[in-house]
Amino acid sequence: MDPMESSSEQDIVEESQKLVDSLDKLRVSAASSSSNFKKKPIIIIVVGMAGSGKTSFLHRLVCHTFDSKSHGYVVNLDPAVMSLPFGANIDIRDTVKYKEVMKQYNLGPNGGILTSLNLFATKFDEVVSVIEKRADQLDYVLVDTPGQIEIFTWSASGAIITEAFASTFPTVVTYVVDTPRSSSPITFMSNMLYACSILYKTRLPLVLAFNKTDVADHKFALEWMEDFEVFQAAIQSDNSYTATLANSLSLSLYEFYRNIRSVGVSAISGAGMDGFFKAIEASAEEYMETYKADLDMRKADKERLEEERKKHEMEKLRKDMESSQGGTVVLNTGLKDRDATEKMMLEEDDEDFQVEDEEDSDDAIDEDDEDDETKHYYL
Ligand SMILES: Nc1nc2c(ncn2[C@@H]2O[C@H](COP(=O)(O)OP(=O)(O)OP(=O)(O)O)[C@@H](O)[C@H]2O)c(=O)[nH]1
């Protein structure tokens, strides 16, 4: 059954291969779209631990943009969410049926969400072009992500989606923290380490949104971030191994704390929204000054490496041709049916010049139902 259409049965291996190919293609198109870069809208990707209040927070952002007469666009990337308190302009659930994916691929809930996101990522260039068409009328694009944070932050599709956004618009990641639950220094440290890893993985500006401030003030967190001695004093009474580790990490994270923006918000009461949008605007400016330049540099590096690789391959091919002195070179890697290969070479002898690369060669062999891997260079 095609999970994108929920129709007839198909081969799972074939589907997976197609998926990998599409992801590769998308990676290339994301990398090459820098020429279309737009300064507006700002993409706000909302991530956070399960239950931290991402969806409620996004709902609050939608209400705030509406009230302040700015134009928002909402993208939902959580295929497993039952109902959303806001209307999403683009919803993964309209394209991928999460339960069908679970059934077809015989997966559990997390595998189902991950595969749904992978399938959706293969179409993400279309999502970006829809937003590009409306770019002039939009101020913000608000992106909700799956409840299980790692499904988005540590998956290939999450990286592809983030990269596709970041190469076309200024993009800011918002990490939602459950403030009441982070009042324990060890939980706080786990959250900060996660936020830090997201910052280094995405290489995008990050805003820490301490949510649920209607229940617990986030002042303690700001104090811990500003002065590691206050944090160490809070953890002093705990002699466990985790506490000692958190203690030493507080020093290491000092640089991270200095470079990110933190705001206290409440998705329920709406407190802190102005401060949050100020942090987003400042981060978007920072994106243009620092992150965009870095992104362009990384892209140029990637292109240079690809160019070098091509040159190296051509040089290798030229040397092979020279050493064969006009004859036929057969690169044999585990040949089983020698006669069949010789026959194949003779049949194709008419060609003036023909080079089969490794991929083509593999295809041909697959088609003929042979498992030999043979490369021929005809001169
Ligand atoms: N008091 C209070 N509760 C909140 C706030 N934000 C969210 N909640 C509650 O926290 C719970 C989880 O909120 P969600 O918005 O579903 O959190 P989520 O991160 O989207 O959850 P998953 O996507 O399922 O992981 C709900 O019961 C919300 O009502 C807040 O600012 N204050």
Swiss-Prot record:
Reported phenotype of the disruption mutant: Embryonic lethality due to embryo development arrest at the octant stage.
GO BP, sorted A to Z: cell division; embryo development ending in seed dormancy
InterPro entries per UniProt: Gpn (IPR004130), Gpn1/Npa3/XAB1 (IPR030230), P-loop_NTPase (IPR027417)
Signal peptide stretch: none
Localisation per UniProt entry: Cytoplasm; Nucleus; Cytoplasm, Cytoskeleton, Spindle; Cytoplasm, Cytoskeleton, Phragmoplast
GO molecular function: GTP binding; GTPase activity
Acidic residues bias locations: 347-372
Short motif (Gly-Pro-Asn (GPN)-loop): ranges: 108-110
Taxonomy, superkingdom: Eukaryota
Coiled-coil zones: 288-322
A Gene Ontology term for the protein's cellular component: nucleus
Listed EC numbers: 3.6.5.-
Keyword Signal (UniProt): no
Binding-site list for GTP: 51-56, 211-214, 267
Residues the UniProt record annotates as site (Stabilizes the phosphate intermediate): 110
SUPFAM superfamilies for the chain: P-loop containing nucleoside triphosphate hydrolases
Family: Belongs to the GPN-loop GTPase family.
Assembly and oligomerization: Heterodimer with QQT1.
Protein name: GPN-loop GTPase QQT2
